[in-house]
């Protein structure tokens, strides 16, 4: 009966997942495989003839890659602008060193060209690369070599990613916190203080005339004139001895003191009719609108003192484009705040709701984009493939945020659930598929091709780790994402993801993966047509 159950793909799938999680929780000297253990169990099951259908693996792959792209999209373009050049150089180093290693070992051991390009595709776990290798050589040797190199291409990257922090003696959680502090440095922490108006140059002038926000970056949220506290408008006039309360970075608050007068600590209390509330932006119509376009002071008599996004406080400048899930700190009369709440949506339930239409539509667009075939001079051609197409489309849609009524975003819990589900399906299928021929390919082709494939996997990662840390001095989290992206290794990214609560590896992976995929295909075509 148990044998019959093993031939049932759904039973085998969940058994592999359960055993994988059990194995993944075992720690040896602080090192564990986590979710990556699923692929090791799958390899064992595959060796004994258990197969998970390819369609389930592809389904899991598109879910995993799509959710990676949706999460990484907003940070992808920022990362590309700020450190993209460095990550791309490391990626090119990975691809070129893999190909040079392959060509060097080809001549050293007399390996035929079809086997070499198959080894490169397998060592870097690139299915599009295999397709190009077979097409370019018209030889079955490419697929045999791919099958030999592929298992270590998967396992080797996982183990390298797991061991690298231990070898470098770097605590990934501390590294993530350090990078978070650096990231916050780009968005200085906002503070609040009050000022006594003592500068004669602003006596009798309105806030519009002194242009405090443009000159300093601080937001004036309250005014005390004589004994009355109010929310100032652009036309509010300042008088000697008035008090104002402002919100901004330390630099902005210091500059405001130079402009208006003496700085004091504390806050001005709100009147009984006034409130300060944190409101969520959940209404689709408001997404991508600039804060200044809402005219909250004119329409509701309210002021936004800060905007919180992804754990960071942003200064509420008029040109700030609002995003779904932004939390706006609003000060005003009770009725005015109610009006702002209606305008923004302020519906916490919508943050956890999951609309499957954008997910399905995004994946459809990604699959279609992956089918495109782009031709280059000299007879070279490139197709993004399933993984590349879905990732590129997800990155673009996530950065756009909204198209008409369609919201291209996903709540954190929903993203995490779909990502984990997709990953487990993918790892189970890939493992059983690689495991079924593992022993046979060793017996048929010996250890030489396996050793060459292992070298093609390891050498680029060692070079990338050395250059990334010692030459470019990038963070280990960025390096892990770049290595897994440069090696086009989705299981490797999963291993990095499971080690730290940070999306930095995912962003780096998404930054370099499309580039790695394109250049790997081009390099394989060059080797297949030029190297003899």
Curated annotation (Swiss-Prot):
Residues annotated as domain RCK C-terminal: 179-262, 263-346
Sample GO molecular function, one term: monoatomic cation transmembrane transporter activity
Compartments where found: Cell membrane
GO biological process, one term: potassium ion transport
Keywords, alphabetical: Cell membrane, Membrane, Repeat, Transmembrane, Transmembrane helix, Transport
Bilayer topology term: Multi-pass membrane protein
Transmembrane segments: 7-26, 30-52, 59-77, 87-109, 116-134, 139-161, 356-378, 388-410, 446-468, 509-531
Domain of life of the native organism: Bacteria
Chief site of localization: membrane
GO cellular component annotations of the record: plasma membrane
Cell membrane as UniProt keyword: yes
Coiled coil feature spans: none
Family as reported in the entry's similarity comment: Belongs to the AAE transporter (TC 2.A.81) family.
UniProt name for this protein: Uncharacterized transporter BF2680
Organism field: Bacteroides fragilis (strain YCH46)
